[in-house]
């Protein structure tokens, strides 16, 4: 296997690319929603199965600038004759971004299928042995989230669907489907994203720690990623609710997994005393904040305590958090940095105070909540 091509979600292409790099190391850029990696081992595939924003994984893939449809079809046919394993096949054609003028999904599928078809390669649209997947990757629509690469030129990508890669869907565990629900619950995709962004190429994670577990959204996704869970909350109702949700997950959704979990009722400053030293920790949390969200520093000191406690528990772990910020950040496509308020403080001050506690920020990305609130997704690694 020479390499893999990863196709990502259109929800936040910039974070998709960051997530891919966190999971498999350096990636090559093809399109805002398509990257390539040379990592193909079992560890890489296992990490990719934990992703939030990777939608498809292709092997033996190629890509091209947009040329005449007939030329593209012939290139895919020639490639298919050389790379398609023996057995039945189907051709799937997808559009990401804006549609490409002059290209028809059905015509590409039919003509590629007809060109590759043969005794060793019968067509089976229902249950094929192999799938040729084509992506017509048009220009990205103006994004909801800032992306410096969204004006990149369109591409056409094709390859074999990697049968050994699977990622669980999001059905069956939305906040309202869990035994214990509160309106503050984090959606599964965002919770999973925080975990995957906590991966690093120089170490393998073992445990996800959430010092503000709420209803257990992050803890649930950690268990489904087959990572151990340590969670705490000061509110006994939340602790009981998280335990109820994790028991449900362990019995109904991941009964065959070996991941363990523990939920404690304690203040964030006591976290090191509760669990001691941990190796391979991802600290993933959504800290509580006041009613005025990004304009208020309510909860700021609690956040800093969590940063200090995390460094004490695992001095070589990683940290990923969501902090309330000014929604104007979502419209910022300028090259000049603006010191937006985050939890009532200028972002530069927040980053400096994290550094004082041993955490160097390596990634920030705004995430839209609604028109009056955004959150800043922050990833930090040990500063020394």
Predicted regions and their residues:
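Conserved AdoMet
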Residues: 38-83
């Amino acid at each position: 296997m020479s390499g893999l091509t990863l196709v990502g979600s259109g929800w936040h292409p910039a974070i998709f690319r960051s997530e891919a790099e966190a999971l498999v190391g350096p990636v090559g850029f093809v399109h805002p929603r398509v990257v390539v990696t040379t990592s193909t081992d079992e560890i890489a595939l296992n990490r990719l199965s934990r992703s939030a924003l990777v939608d498809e994984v292709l092997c033996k893939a190629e890509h091209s600038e947009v040329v005449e449809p007939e030329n593209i079809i012939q290139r895919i046919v020639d490639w298919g004759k050389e790379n398609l394993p023996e057995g039945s096949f189907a051709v799937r054609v997808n559009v990401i971004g804006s549609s490409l003028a002059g290209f028809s999904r059905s015509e590409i599928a039919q003509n590629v299928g007809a060109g590759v078809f043969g005794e060793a390669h019968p067509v089976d649209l229902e249950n094929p042995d192999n799938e040729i997947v084509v992506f017509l990757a048009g220009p990205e629509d103006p994004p909801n989230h800032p992306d410096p690469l969204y004006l990149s030129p369109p591409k056409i990508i094709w390859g074999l669907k990697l049968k050994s890669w699977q990622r669980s869907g999001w059905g069956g565990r939305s906040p309202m489907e869990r035994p214990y629900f509160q309106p503050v619950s984090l959606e599964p995709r965002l919770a999973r994203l925080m975990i995957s962004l906590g991966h690093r190429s120089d170490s393998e994670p073992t445990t996800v720690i959430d010092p503000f577990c709420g209803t257990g959204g992050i803890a649930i996704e950690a268990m489904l990623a087959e990572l151990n869970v340590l969670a705490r909350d000061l509110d006994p109702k939340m602790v009981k609710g998280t335990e109820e949700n994790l028991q449900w997950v362990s019995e109904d959704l991941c009964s065959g997994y070996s991941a363990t979990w523990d939920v404690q009722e304690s203040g964030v400053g006591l976290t090191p005393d509760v669990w001691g030293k941990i190796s391979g920790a991802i600290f993933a949390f959504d800290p509580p904040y006041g009613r005025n969200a990004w304009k208020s520093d309510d909860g700021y000191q609690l956040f800093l305590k969590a940063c200090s406690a995390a460094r004490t528990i695992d001095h070589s772990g990683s940290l990923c958090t969501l902090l309330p910020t000014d929604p104007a950040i979502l419209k910022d496509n300028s090259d000049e940095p603006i010191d937006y308020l985050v939890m009532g403080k200028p972002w530069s001050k927040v980053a400096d105070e994290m550094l004082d506690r041993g955490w160097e920020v390596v990634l920030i990305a705004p995430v839209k909540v609604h028109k009056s609130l955004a959150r800043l997704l922050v990833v930090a690694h040990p500063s020394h």
